[in-house]
Curated annotation (Swiss-Prot):
This is Meromycolate extension acyl carrier protein. PANTHER family: ACYL CARRIER PROTEIN, CARRIER DOMAIN-CONTAINING PROTEIN. It comes from the Bacteria. Keywords: Cytoplasm, Fatty acid biosynthesis, Fatty acid metabolism, Lipid biosynthesis, Lipid metabolism, Phosphopantetheine, Phosphoprotein. Belongs to the acyl carrier protein (ACP) family. One of its GO terms (biological process) is lipid A biosynthetic process. It is found in: Cytoplasm. Residues 3-81 form the Carrier domain. Gene3D superfamilies: ACP-like. NCBIfam families: AcpM (NF040636), PRK00982.1-1 (NF002147), PRK00982.1-2 (NF002148), PRK00982.1-4 (NF002150). The modification O-(pantetheine 4'-phosphoryl)serine is found at S41. The lineage of its organism: Bacteria, Bacillati, Actinomycetota, Actinomycetes, Mycobacteriales. InterPro entries: ACP (IPR003231), ACP-like_sf (IPR036736), Meromycolate-ACP (IPR053393), PP-bd_ACP (IPR009081).
């Protein structure tokens, strides 16, 4: 089973908080890194590096430039998972052991926003 959108958002929110201090509750799929979250290019590179480490993916510089929103990163990671199901399974186990509360919080927030 692939990693869910909520699990990826929770992981990215933790990374963004660590790099920038932005509260995870502020991180939603439609938020733009530059326009909404005011993340500069240096911080974006740090977020990308930590995302690569956390999710076991490689984000080439030319792809990074096109990832403008949190949702773009989620879709990118999900696409990479579809291309490598074994890595996705290992990632799911890692995420479930690392941050189940963060995932539940994001899931509840997204459900509330969709109502």
């Amino acid at each position: 089973m692939p990693v869910t959108q909520e699990e990826i958002i929770a992981g990215i929110a933790e990374i963004i908080e660590e790099v920038t201090g932005i509260e995870p509750s502020e991180i939603t799929p439609e938020k733009s890194f530059v326009d909404d979250l005011d993340i500069d290019s240096l911080s974006m590179v740090e977020i990308a590096v930590q995302t690569e480490d956390k999710y076991g993916v490689k984000i080439p510089d030319e792809d990074l430039a096109g990832l403008r929103t949190v949702g773009d990163v989620v879709a990118y990671i999900q696409k990479l998972e579809e291309e490598n199901p074994e890595a996705a399974q290992a990632l799911r186990a890692k995420i479930e052991s690392e941050n189940p509360d963060a995932v539940a919080n994001v899931q509840a927030r997204l459900e509330a926003e969709s109502k």
